[in-house]
Amino acid sequence: MTRRTPIELYRNIGISAHIDAGKTTTTERILFYTGITHKLGEVHEGAAVMDWMEQEQERGITITSAATTAFWRGMAGNYPEHRINIIDTPGHVDFTIEVERSMRVLDGACMVYDSVGGVQPQSETVWRQANKYRVPRIAFVNKMDRIGADFLRVQRQIVERLKGDAVPVQLPIGAEDNFQGVVDLVKMKAILWDEASQGVSFKYEDVPAPMLELANQWRDKLVEKAAEANEVLLEKYLSGEALSEEEIKTGLRQRTIANEIVPMLCGSAFKNKGVQAMLDAVLDYLPSPLDVPAIKGHDEHDKEIERRPSDKDPFSALAFKIMTDPFVGQLVFFRAYSGVVKSGDSVLNPLKNKKERLGRILQMHANERKEINEVYAGDIAAAVGLKDVTTGDTLTDPGHVIILERMIFPEPVISQAVEPKTKADQEKMSLALNRLAQEDPSFRVRTDEESGQTIISGMGELHLEILVDRMKREFNVEATVGKPQVAYRETIRKKVEGVEGKFVKQSGGRGQYGHAVITVEPQAAGKGFEFIDAIKGGVIPREFIPAVERGIVDTLNTGVLAGYPVVDVKVTLTFGSYHDVDSNENAFRMAGSMAFKEGLRRATPVLLEPMMQVEVETPEDFTGNVMGDLSSRRGMVQGMEDIAGGGGKLVRAEVPLAEMFGYSTSLRSLTQGRATYSMEFKHYAEAPRQVAEQVIAARTGSTRA
């Protein structure tokens, strides 16, 4: 079977937005117009095709990035058939990890904004992630039929808050109830969609006379932005010649792909207006796999190599999502960067050094699937039969190995104890939790050594709530959940040298002997743990040095203050001694552990707590109450700004997570239910002495801090 679509006609895009900006409805309309779904799924009826997990339908928020393939020839049918692979990404802060992992495999993104709310806190998070992976983007201002809709206000917010060069390629005709269609600034024509056909048919008309002046102003700006793409266009523009439609589009495309501008469009997905033109903009301005840099990685000898998006290059792909499907078992979603792979082929997972056979290959449409025989460079598909693959692993041709850069996932900030309700649930629960942890790298499961309880950790209360809910629905496990606990950390503040750990045991015949001397010092925040071997003259034999490191690593999980994991510490092994007969790995492991514990005690240990970036949108009357309440929670208010359109105030603050439990309830009572807030993890900071003493006392019964 040969490739159906040439690679230059591929678009791998994400649809990304703040919760409630109408992203799922927008995706639904895309599926409808591209001819896949016949009845439009409305989110508020709980019927959207992309939101295919039960909890998503109940909560009306999108949790899992479902990948969908659609074909598009332009709304006037005047383009060659393009293949659009769409990754639907969640908009809730607790699922930022989902957005992050889909950004990694996209070539372009469509950012959806609410015409009234504009740039909201989550929009900023998503924008930062898109910047991190240098993803070119277009913006779609949705819900133009809402009261208070203002397209140009959103344009200003993108420029001021996100520092993006937002370039309108359309202007809305009317707004709120009077929203009729858009002015296409490239063609300088009005586009009006026919409501009877649910927006499938449309007509071009002249720009309405009252809008001509505004349209000409914005068109001049648009043409200037396009002309700056290259010298040929710039010269033509400066000499006063008019640029053709094609030249304007070429210039805008070049600058969008270079991440210099963000073309802006508008519409109302719910009213079937504007989504079709937004799809045309995806073809016009967002990159194909050929327009983005070749993917880089390392071979097995750590030499940097790259793979071009060509069917002729050896096969390479990145597994970006694992899902458990009730019918086919584990599904691995992957993005093929180069080469071709067929079902039945063997691929290598170089990180685990395991060869695996690709069973069936499926092309996904929300939660429906079509079996295909092969996958070409640039495509996104799901494979059945890969047992040991986790998110972020590379899949490669066994004869031409490449290891692509791994994804980095944030550490969880919140934990809960979870217990099965019955003995029968016990086994099912550990299976369910392991499955869920395999799917979601920001979710961790461990057993507390002292209490024997199972502890689950994640990125927020909603994150854990949904995972427990899934355990009940998908695995029939009834569980009781404890109160959320903060994931504290420990670190040190000073350097100590010459710390000794000596493990000596005489028992009858053969004894045990291990002796290590270390230097322990703090590292910059986020640097993690580092071990340096500075042994000279063989005072500790080579074969025992890894054992010393292992002993230290074992101890990292339980700090000396309250037993929390230790972070950002550097340990240098400087000296030691051994015994010809009695020394062994275990003895040196114990010596390493003893030295490290002693080093931590002497190096001024401190407790770290997670700090959250909190943003509250509140009516002006309640601003004082909200700020006072945040301060009482040990929050540092960092600023306040007006919400455009007289919509109250946006208060930004940094607050310890420990003080934020139950915040939504108290915010409701403070503001009569009229304020909303969002919260995301910012960084770890040293806990004040009084707080540290309370935490330590609760864990250990003593208050040493």
Curated annotation (Swiss-Prot):
Entry coiled-coil feature ranges: none
KW Nucleotide-binding (keyword) present: yes
GO biological process: ribosome disassembly
Any single Gene Ontology cellular-component annotation: cytoplasm
Keywords: Cytoplasm, Elongation factor, GTP-binding, Nucleotide-binding, Protein biosynthesis
Major site of localization recorded for this protein: cytoplasm
Localisation: Cytoplasm
Domain tr-type G per the UniProt entry, residue ranges: 8-290
Gene3D superfamilies: 3.30.230.10, 3.30.70.240, Elongation Factor G (Translational Gtpase), domain 3, P-loop containing nucleotide triphosphate hydrolases, Translation factors
Any GO molecular function: guanosine tetraphosphate binding
Classification via SUPFAM superfamilies: EF-G C-terminal domain-like, P-loop containing nucleoside triphosphate hydrolases, Ribosomal protein S5 domain 2-like, Translation proteins
A Pfam family annotated for this UniProt entry: EFG_III
Family statement drawn from the similarity comment of this UniProt entry: Belongs to the TRAFAC class translation factor GTPase superfamily. Classic translation factor GTPase family. EF-G/EF-2 subfamily.
Function according to Swiss-Prot or TrEMBL: Catalyzes the GTP-dependent ribosomal translocation step during translation elongation. During this step, the ribosome changes from the pre-translocational (PRE) to the post-translocational (POST) state as the newly formed A-site-bound peptidyl-tRNA and P-site-bound deacylated tRNA move to the P and E sites, respectively. Catalyzes the coordinated movement of the two tRNA molecules, the mRNA and conformational changes in the ribosome.
Record protein name field: Elongation factor G 2
Organism (species): Bordetella avium (strain 197N)
